[in-house]
UniProtKB/Swiss-Prot annotation:
Pathway annotation: Carbohydrate metabolism; galactose metabolism
Gene encoding the protein: galK
PANTHER family reported for this sequence: GALACTOKINASE-RELATED, MEVALONATE KINASE/GALACTOKINASE
Binding site for Mg(2+): 130, 162
Highest classification ranks of the organism: Bacteria, Pseudomonadati, Pseudomonadota, Gammaproteobacteria, Enterobacterales
Superkingdom to which the source organism belongs: Bacteria
Regions that span the bilayer: none
Keyword Transferase: yes
Stored NCBIfam families: gal_kin, PRK05101.1
Organism whose genome encodes this protein: Shigella flexneri serotype 5b (strain 8401)
Binding site for ATP: 124-130
Site entry (Transition state stabilizer), positions: 28
GO MF term list: ATP binding; galactokinase activity; magnesium ion binding
Protein family per UniProt: Belongs to the GHMP kinase family. GalK subfamily.
Protein name from the UniProt record: Galactokinase
Subcellular location: Cytoplasm
Amino acid sequence: MSLKEKTQSLFANAFGYPATHTIQAPGRVNLIGEHTDYNDGFVLPCAIDYQTVISCAPRDDRKVRVMAADYENQLDEFSLNAPIVAHENYQWANYVRGVVKHLQLRNNSFGGVDMVISGNVPQGAGLSSSASLEVAVGTVLQQLYHLPLDGAQIALNGQEAENQFVGCNCGIMDQLISALGKKDHALLIDCRSLGTKAVSMPKGVAVVIINSNFKRTLVGSEYNTRREQCETGARFFQQPALRDVTIEEFNAVAHELDPIVAKRVRHILTENARTVEAASALEQGDLKRMDELMAESHASMRDDFEITVPQIDTLVEIVKAVIGDKGGVRMTGGGFGGCIVALIPEELVPAVQQAVAEQYEAKTGIKETFYVCKPSQGAGQC
């Protein structure tokens, strides 16, 4: 049974009438451009065919009822007439409440709604299950009440909800790609202007995501430290963000910087350049150049930004040994565990899967999870 069928059936059973709309919003993977988003830089993600699906209908009052199919059909109810506050027990409900509250704060006028939510974006894998939920809820209200919002505004609203209501600091990339993703394309995003450019993906190439299943422990504290180091670097150059510093300017005075800060700055500057070049390489179907850029990105994250762990490096090495220069592979996400992403010719996917199955657990004691994805369409009706 598809997520659409599942949520429609649950909706009818729970609420006693049929849903009028079904909306989906996808998760994402970032192909290249790591930790560049909060430095006003470039990222190159694609939406994936794992998504959050919501069957819904408008109500003729001011009540919101939300059922979470993946959390034992837990039900949350709240009124649009009262101040929206955090739910004491259901963390999932706060993503919904946050999006609704921030849409209200943006002076959008809408009535009540019934929703049933289900999703298959793996949680805790760095594939943006939370952003996909936020964008799905925003799209539900936009579609049901014809709100004058475009995808970028729905994305910004979701980011605001996560930062201010849920209390998790995140950049804009995750929500933006979920809202604006394009089938068979990646999206080059300028995180300063929020401008986007669709980049066609080469035919016959699979997007493979492998979760190391190494439990991330340092990610919060180390993430904040990296941010501070980048801000220190930008201040040294008297610029608003590292986006505004050239590699030539950096090389001329690198020796004057604190050695750790210098390494962090070098990663951001070179990663930004790699990301813009990767968009061109991908569009031209130049997998050999993509391989080089992804390898350089991984080495930079390992040696300059210092956010990889041995388990991730092992996974990258296993995949690289199989694909050679026919595709690219690197760590993706915040670091200290999580996933790797690989662009692999479809005919090599079984060999990669076999090599990883045979070697990764033997070397690390951890079993990986393997996902083969297609670049998918952003949020909308399904």
